[in-house]
């Protein structure tokens, strides 16, 4: 560790604290992840060492490179390449203007390329979320923390005791399935794909709905504000908006049962027809409310027909029928994919 100088703390993730650091010998800027270990165990589990050592072999342009593993006494440090920002922060910063479709398409395509590579090497992520998708100023997006869930387990709480989000967790996991596949990562990425399209403001949906119900066909105050902001070059900020602007997750549950029910309300309550074997899962209850499937055009309005087709295949209930990363890359949605450069506020 004497070869690294910590510059600043840049985050506290699922497995520990992350620092921006500089290699004193080479001058290279890296992300230094200090893994939080169970104090009741003696040192670092050998299984964890084996798992993360394998990750050093995952060389792909869309996977954050694990440069080194430093094991000292009861501490474990992972040295990763450094990227400017995570997708969550970028989406928050883009909440007022939205993310351009070409950039969403490029990001999803790149992430699927990274997933396809890892899945072909039988490595799952199991905990995909916007916080561990990292971007740079050149338009690249990379998967971070790959394989750490298998090495260290998926904790209930983070380093700072924050409850780990359930928003991107596949229904087979929520229903207690102990043996799952690469399909869990596809589900998570599908949720993130939808979220990149969704922008909301507090009270905006209610405001817009009331405006239209009262027979006024003009734009509601916030829509008018957004239209003016766009016409003026998007120079206004979320802080100056009439209501706080935030992105909206597709399934923002606050407990496992709430998460399941949010999924059911949108995709319909699954039965043996759409998902053979679902009623035999450990946490399935015959008493679950029976909801009908919603029209996808109303769930994610900005998506075109190809986008809705891809999303519905990524969010297929049956993991065996959920589209694979490799197959998704060949979907018509990507026929005009490019690699635009994002406007990052670093």
From Swiss-Prot:
Activity regulation statement: Phosphorylation at Thr-14 or Tyr-15 inactivates the enzyme, while phosphorylation at Thr-160 activates it. Stimulated by MYC. Inactivated by CDKN1A (p21).
Modified-residue entries (N6-acetyllysine), positions: 6
Deletion consequences: Reduced body size and impaired neural progenitor cell proliferation. Sterility due to defective meiosis; no effect on mitotic cells. Premature translocation of CDK1 from the cytoplasm to the nucleus compensating CDK2 loss. Prolonged and impaired DNA repair activity upon DNA damage by gamma-irradiation.
Main subcellular location: cytoplasm
Subcellular location: Cytoplasm, Cytoskeleton, Microtubule organizing center, Centrosome; Nucleus, Cajal body; Cytoplasm; Endosome
Cofactor details (free text): Binds 2 Mg(2+) ions.
Cofactor entry: Mg(2+)
Active site: 127 (proton acceptor)
Presence of the UniProt keyword Acetylation in the record: yes
Record's keyword terms, sorted: Acetylation, ATP-binding, Cell cycle, Cell division, Cytoplasm, Cytoskeleton, DNA damage, DNA repair, Endosome, Kinase, Magnesium, Meiosis, Metal-binding, Mitosis, Nucleotide-binding, Nucleus, Phosphoprotein, Serine/threonine-protein kinase, Transferase
Gene Ontology annotations for the cellular component aspect, listed alphabetically: Cajal body; centrosome; chromosome, telomeric region; condensed chromosome; cyclin A1-CDK2 complex; cyclin A2-CDK2 complex; cyclin E1-CDK2 complex; cyclin E2-CDK2 complex
InterPro entries tied to this protein: CDK (IPR050108), Kinase-like_dom_sf (IPR011009), Prot_kinase_dom (IPR000719), Protein_kinase_ATP_BS (IPR017441), Ser/Thr_kinase_AS (IPR008271)
Phosphotyrosine: residues bearing it: 15, 19
EC number: 2.7.11.22
Primary enzyme class: transferase
Gene Ontology terms, MF aspect: ATP binding; cyclin binding; cyclin-dependent protein kinase activity; cyclin-dependent protein serine/threonine kinase activity; histone kinase activity; kinase activity; magnesium ion binding; protein domain specific binding
Residue intervals of the Protein kinase domain: 4-334
Modified positions (Phosphoserine) in chain numbering: 218
SUPFAM superfamilies, per database record: Protein kinase-like (PK-like) (SSF56112)
Binding-site residues, ATP: 10-18, 33, 81-83, 86, 129-132, 145
Function: Serine/threonine-protein kinase involved in the control of the cell cycle; essential for meiosis, but dispensable for mitosis. Phosphorylates CABLES1, CTNNB1, CDK2AP2, ERCC6, NBN, USP37, p53/TP53, NPM1, CDK7, RB1, BRCA2, MYC, NPAT, EZH2. Triggers duplication of centrosomes and DNA.
Family: Belongs to the protein kinase superfamily. CMGC Ser/Thr protein kinase family. CDC2/CDKX subfamily.
Subunit description: Found in a complex with CABLES1, CCNA1 and CCNE1. Interacts with CABLES1. Interacts with UHRF2. Part of a complex consisting of UHRF2, CDK2 and CCNE1. Interacts with the Speedy/Ringo proteins SPDYA and SPDYC. Interaction with SPDYA promotes kinase activation via a conformation change that alleviates obstruction of the substrate-binding cleft by the T-loop. Found in a complex with both SPDYA and CDKN1B/KIP1. Binds to RB1 and CDK7.
Protein name (Swiss-Prot/TrEMBL): Cyclin-dependent kinase 2
Name of the coding gene: Cdk2
């Amino acid at each position: 560790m004497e070869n690294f100088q910590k510059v600043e703390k840049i985050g506290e993730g699922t497995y520990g604290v992350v620092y921006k650091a500089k290699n004193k010998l080479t001058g290279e800027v890296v992300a230094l992840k200090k893994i939080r270990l169970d104090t009741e165990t003696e040192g670092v589990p050998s299984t964890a060492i084996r798992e993360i050592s394998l990750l050093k072999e995952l060389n792909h342009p869309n996977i954050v490179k694990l440069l080194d593993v430093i094991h000292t006494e009861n501490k474990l440090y992972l040295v990763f390449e450094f990227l400017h920002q995570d997708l969550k922060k970028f989406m928050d910063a883009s909440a007022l203007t939205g993310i351009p479709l070409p950039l969403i398409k490029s990001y999803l395509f790149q992430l699927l390329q990274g997933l396809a590579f890892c899945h072909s090497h039988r490595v799952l992520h199991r905990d995909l979320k916007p916080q561990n998708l990292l971007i740079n100023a050149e338009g690249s997006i990379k998967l971070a923390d790959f394989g750490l869930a298998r090495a260290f387990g998926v904790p209930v709480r983070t380093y700072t005791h924050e409850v780990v989000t359930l928003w991107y967790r596949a229904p087979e996991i929520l229903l207690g399935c102990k043996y799952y596949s690469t399909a869990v990562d596809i589900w998570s990425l599908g949720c993130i794909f939808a979220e990149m399209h969704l922008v909301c403001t507090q009270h905006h949906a209610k405001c817009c709905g009331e405006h239209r119900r009262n027979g006024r066909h003009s734009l509601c105050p916030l829509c008018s504000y957004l239209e003016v902001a766009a016409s003026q070059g998007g120079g206004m900020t979320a802080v100056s908006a009439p209501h706080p602007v935030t992105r909206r997750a597709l399934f923002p549950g606050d407990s496992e049962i709430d998460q399941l029910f949010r999924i059911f309300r949108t995709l319909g309550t699954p039965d043996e027809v759409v998902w053979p074997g679902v009623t035999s899962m450990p946490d399935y209850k015959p008493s679950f409310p029976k909801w009908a499937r919603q029209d996808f055009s109303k769930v994610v309005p900005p998506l075109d027909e190809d986008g809705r087709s891809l999303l519905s295949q990524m969010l297929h209930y049956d993991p065996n029928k959920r589209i694979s990363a490799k197959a998704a890359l060949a979907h018509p949605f990507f026929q005009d994919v490019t690699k635009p450069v994002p406007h990052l506020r670093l």
